Amino acid sequence: MKQVQVAVVGASGYTGQELLRILLNHRGVKLVCATSRQYAGQPLWEVFPRFRQVPGSGLKFTDSDVEAIAATGAEVAFLALPHGVAASYARGLVDRGVRVIDLSADFRLDSPDVYEEYYGNPHPDTALMQEAVYGLPEWRREEIARARIVASPGCYPTSILLPLIPLFRAGMLEPEDVVACSGSGVSGAGRKASIPLLFCECNESFHAYGVPKHRHLSEIEQELSHAAGETVVMSFTPHLIPVNTGICSTITAKVKKGADPESVGRLLEEAYAAAPFVRLLGRNQPADTKNVTRTNCVDIGWAYDPRTNRVILMSAEDNVVKGAGGQAVQSFNIMCGFDETEGLWVL
């Protein structure tokens, strides 16, 4: 098997750690660069002892700029950086011939105005923003394969878009009557030290946040509007739940007049028959985060409530795997001509 030289930029957070875990076990990857200002000079295994004696884990973190990253010979770079920071690295790397998979929000949106509305600053590179491909592999395989830059979707959007896109594409759902409630593990808030994220603050606690306009709402509405061919407006309420990883989303949507709610199962099956990481549980089968932990899978169940004429969709994923690092590697596989599942069947 050919090997692609890979860099992970911003490799010391939870998403970066997950990328390293997957890439160190990927037969088609030669890891040539991992950056971290905090841990520069230390080998991967010393910072993350779980990697001790794993081949490749002796690579040392560096505090590298764009030029130094490109000089390592990296052909593909994963950016696990905060929004606003990632864009400057992306432009420099793409201009040097390095293909980029960005896990921040910098290139997920089509509109610079929407980006500024949700993220509070003007977009730093609108030209590259227009070029970027939204990297939801189940729906963008051909575009991902050709892309110079892929914007890997957010964790919440992945759990909501995959159940809804087939139904909106079929014209089944009302575009202004969608409600999603999601719960995410604490790792979704990142690895930084923060009082609200301390164990005694999070444990035995369950609460909403980011109400009423969480940043991920922007990309969810954007992609659902593309699928529906009309503007979709929805209500989205995320919650913090006291687990390390996992997202569980419950989505309800009103069925359009004349549409057949009994076709939900068929539409999902047709959409994901060739999708290795989408597991359809069937009617009246709720998804459970414990069944997707440490996997790149999304489990989806569904139901119909005739009293309210609403479809109920239930999904579960691991927020740092399918919701972040795993999905990014899935796009990498497509970009580089590997089997889509390479390195990702770790259960």
From Swiss-Prot:
Entry coiled-coil feature ranges: none
Any single GO molecular-function term of the entry would be: N-acetyl-gamma-glutamyl-phosphate reductase activity
Q: Which Pfam families does this one have?
A: Semialdhyde_dh, Semialdhyde_dhC_1
The answer to keyword Nucleus applying to this record is no
Which InterPro entries does the entry link to? AGPR_AS (IPR023013), AGPR_type-1 (IPR000706), NAD(P)-bd_dom_sf (IPR036291), NAGSA_dehydrogenase (IPR050085), Semialdehyde_DH_NAD-bd (IPR000534)
State any GO CC term: cytoplasm
The EC code for this enzyme is 1.2.1.38
Pathway assignment reads: Amino-acid biosynthesis; L-arginine biosynthesis; N(2)-acetyl-L-ornithine from L-glutamate: step 3/4
Q: Where in the cell is it found?
A: Cytoplasm
Q: Which reaction does it catalyse?
A: N-acetyl-L-glutamate 5-semialdehyde + phosphate + NADP(+) = N-acetyl-L-glutamyl 5-phosphate + NADPH + H(+)
Q: Output one GO BP term.
A: L-arginine biosynthetic process
* Entry annotated with the keyword Oxidoreductase: yes
Q: Which residues carry out catalysis? A: C155
The Swiss-Prot or TrEMBL record describes its family as follows: Belongs to the NAGSA dehydrogenase family. Type 1 subfamily.
Q: What does this protein do?
A: Catalyzes the NADPH-dependent reduction of N-acetyl-5-glutamyl phosphate to yield N-acetyl-L-glutamate 5-semialdehyde.
Instruction: Report what the protein is called.
Output: N-acetyl-gamma-glutamyl-phosphate reductase
